[in-house]
């Protein structure tokens, strides 16, 4: 009975370790901020520029594109 409890305890600890490692894995996303080139820059321009710079022009990989003043914030899939 003691052996069974010991094996069960080790199995539970291993399951916990594996689940922690899975939650800290890379999500395949990145984010960055860059200065906009002119004042007429729109949110859509920000999204297109983010796609051009960081995803080889793939617009569907851009998750978030925000324009705040003279900065463009992008979050995208890598």
From Swiss-Prot:
In which tissues does this protein get expressed? Expressed by the venom gland.
Q: Which UniProt keywords apply?
A: Disulfide bond, Neurotoxin, Secreted, Signal, Toxin
Q: Which GO terms describe its cellular component?
A: extracellular region
For whether the record's keyword set contains Signal, the answer is yes
Query: Which residues belong to the signal peptide in this entry?
Result: 1-25
Q: Does the keyword Translocase apply?
A: no
The molecular function terms in GO held by this entry are:
toxin activity
Spell out the post-translational modification annotation for this entry: Contains 2 disulfide bonds.
The subcellular location is: Secreted
The Swiss-Prot or TrEMBL record describes its family as follows: Belongs to the scolopendra neurotoxin 3 family.
Q: What is this protein called?
A: Scoloptoxin SSD996
